[in-house]
């Protein structure tokens, strides 16, 4: 029995190590800033603009925090929440700068990308921040788009976790004409126009042909997440789409929208079933969001689609590109669950037999065999990975037992 105790001890140690490694890489900017009330306004707007979610998602980040007094300078200008998001995204650097690194900048000056730059919101290099080590040990910051004026200086370090996250207090808000520029209000965000400009014209066309575009557009103000299949995926699916009834066509299109804004970080942290625009009464029309590392997949029980990237992120609207058309089980479940009808002792007329055996108008055809094969392959791969993990654990346990 001693070897069993050793094996159990090894398993506990492995679990604790895994838990420690997971927690050691995590950070929460909201909790970090909540420790100092001087940053309460800055902290509030990081959450309100969902920048906090993006900060927590990244493994290497620097936040240039400003106190309540400095924040009042931009709030008094009456900027919209979307403008404030752009301005604050200049304060999030996608590289690590601790106090030590600030004073060891090569040649005394450098420029680094902010989140305003890395997310594609900025044009050219207008989202870069200039950092300069001035004589006397002072460090100054300025937006490259603002004639590289050094408008703020380093005050103190708030929190540092080397090479993961650094929170530095700076004296003034960093801003620029481009960041302050008015952004489109939700009612100005025309979804079909956005889709057509972002390589989703085929999906935009079926939105309009079914009349579902109005439902999507009417939902934008309250929050909308759209999963847009690529043009090639829609093109491959069109023969089956054309065979659907009008009601099922509309339901399938609505199935690609969620009536809530969900950033990529929210999707990654919220595994489970989600409702869609097609959800109504007993018709669930939901699918499951699953995460595997950095990858996000959408599982419908009929097909699994992968999120390929973000096409548009302007709260309250976000649009993702996916690699497959989402097929709801409410439309295709008959194909998955139906069994052959019992043979009748009476012979049927030839034409009736043909009608009974023929595929239904809404049934998937050849491609659905491929979907089934894909699922079997995924299960096989999962079994293989599980087997490898078990083998590794057994090996470790055996090693501990031998000690």
UniProtKB/Swiss-Prot annotation:
A lipid is attached at residue 378 (GPI-anchor amidated alanine). It holds the Pfam family Fasciclin. Its main location: membrane. Residues 1-26 form the signal peptide. Residues 379-403 form a propeptide. Keywords: Cell membrane, Glycoprotein, GPI-anchor, Lipoprotein, Membrane, Proteoglycan, Repeat, Signal. InterPro entries: FAS1_dom_sf, FAS1_domain, Plant_FLA. Gene3D superfamilies: FAS1 domain. It is found in: Cell membrane. Residues 338-371 are annotated as: Disordered. Glycans are attached at residues 28, 130, 164, 248. It is a lipid-anchor; GPI-anchor. Induction: Down-regulated by abscisic acid (ABA). Residues 27-174, 187-326 form the FAS1 domain. The keyword Methyltransferase does not apply. One of its GO terms (cellular component) is plant-type vacuole. Belongs to the fasciclin-like AGP family. May be a cell surface adhesion protein. This is Fasciclin-like arabinogalactan protein 2. It comes from Arabidopsis thaliana (Mouse-ear cress). The lineage of its organism: Eukaryota, Viridiplantae, Streptophyta, Embryophyta, Tracheophyta. The gene is FLA2.
């Amino acid at each position: 029995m001693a070897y069993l105790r050793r094996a159990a001890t090894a398993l506990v140690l492995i679990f604790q190590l895994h838990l420690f490694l997971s927690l050691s890489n995590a950070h929460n900017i909201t909790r970090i800033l909540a420790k100092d009330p001087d940053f309460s306004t800055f902290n509030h707007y990081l959450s309100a603009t969902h920048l906090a979610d993006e900060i927590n998602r990244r493994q290497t980040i620097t936040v240039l925090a400003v106190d309540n007094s400095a924040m009042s300078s931009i709030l008094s200008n009456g900027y919209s929440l979307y403008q404030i998001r752009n301005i604050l995204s200049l304060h999030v650097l996608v590289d690590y700068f601790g106090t030590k690194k600030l004073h060891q900048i090569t040649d005394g000056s450098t420029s680094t990308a902010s989140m305003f730059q890395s997310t594609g919101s900025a044009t050219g290099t207008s989202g870069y921040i200039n950092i300069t080590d001035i004589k006397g040990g002072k460090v100054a910051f300025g937006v490259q788009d603002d004639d590289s004026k050094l408008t703020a200086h380093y005050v103190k370090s708030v929190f540092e976790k080397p090479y993961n996250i650094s929170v530095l207090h700076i004296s003034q808000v960093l801003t620029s004409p481009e960041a302050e520029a008015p952004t489109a209000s939700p009612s100005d965000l025309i979804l079909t126009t956005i889709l057509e400009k972002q390589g989703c014209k085929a999906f935009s066309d079926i939105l309009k042909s079914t009349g579902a575009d109005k439902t999507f557009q009417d939902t934008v103000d309250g929050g909308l997440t759209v999963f847009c299949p690529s043009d090639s995926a829609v093109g491959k699916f069109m023969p089956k789409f054309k065979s659907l009834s009008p009601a099922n066509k509309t339901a399938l299109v609505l199935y690609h929208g969620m009536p809530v804004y969900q950033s990529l970080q929210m999707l990654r942290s919220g595994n489970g079933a989600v409702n869609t625009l097609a959800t109504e009464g007993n018709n669930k029309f939901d699918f499951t969001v699953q995460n595997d590392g950095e990858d996000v997949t959408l599982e419908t029980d009929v097909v699994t689609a992968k999120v390929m990237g973000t096409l548009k992120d302007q709260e309250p609207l976000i649009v993702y590109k996916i690699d497959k058309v989402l097929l709801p089980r409410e439309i295709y479940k008959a194909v998955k669950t139906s069994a052959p009808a019992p043979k009748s002792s009476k012979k049927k007329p030839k034409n009736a037999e043909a009608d009974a055996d023929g595929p239904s108008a809404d049934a998937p055809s050849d491609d659905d065999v491929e979907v089934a094969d894909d699922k079997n392959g995924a299960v096989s791969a999962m079994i293989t990975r599980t087997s490898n993990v078990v083998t590794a654990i057994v090996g470790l346990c055996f090693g501990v037992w031998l000690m």
